[in-house]
Regions:
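A helix-coil-helix interface module used to build multimeric assemblies
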Residues: 1-157, 161-170, 176
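Short, intrinsically disordered, charge-balanced linker/junction segments flanking boundaries
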Residues: 3, 179-185
């Protein structure tokens, strides 16, 4: 809505009214959804009921998928950030323990049976390397899911300018989908 008003597609007054009045009530959404049988239409109707006259611009040019997919991307990105943070803590602790136990003897294993002695520190160093790869995979996964798709029905930008998608993506620290469709593939 903000970029639509900047582009002159909707009145600036409407964008301000939407920003100031938009809110929702989960219980009301549930009641509306029971009638409409569509979760996102129920959400739109509920938010619109609080906005007033400018509500006609609230969902202008976008599809439910534009909003739902982009929201899901944000959730995935935020989840990945939590996992990455925790993996870094795990790595730090494994490294500390590996150094502490660099001379702690333990039995090695090969093919599931006892083998030559190794140190517990070596075993932990191996775990450290594995978790470091997991951290890199998680960073890559975060990058892959950090996608914004605001391209309108069937992803053709017929009802919304691509600059809106770029604007929203920048605001949300997401990338845009390279080949747009109605949903993020």
């Amino acid at each position: 809505v903000e970029k639509l008003s900047i582009n002159g597609v909707i009145p600036k007054k409407a964008a301000k009214e939407i920003r100031n009045k938009a809110k929702f009530n989960v219980k009301e959404i549930e009641l509306i959804e029971n009638k409409t049988k569509h979760d996102f239409i129920a959400y739109i109707n509920n938010v619109s009921s609080y906005i007033g006259e400018s509500a006609k611009y609230f969902h202008h040019g976008v599809t439910s998928s534009d909003i739902i997919d982009t929201s899901f991307s944000i959730q995935l990105k935020q989840s990945a950030e939590i996992i990455i943070k925790e993996l870094k803590l795990v790595l730090k602790e494994i490294k500390i323990k590996a150094i502490k136990h660099k001379n702690t003897i333990m039995i090695g294993r090969s093919h599931g049976i006892h083998a030559e002695p190794i140190t517990f520190g070596l075993k932990l160093a191996s775990f450290y390397c594995e978790f470091k790869r997991n951290l890199n995979r998680m960073k890559s996964a975060k990058d892959e899911v950090s996608i914004c798709a605001i391209s309108g029905p069937v992803g053709t930008y017929n009802s919304i300018d691509p600059s809106v998608e770029k604007y929203v993506a920048a605001k949300l620290d997401l990338k845009t989908e390279n080949v747009s469709t109605q949903v993020i593939p």
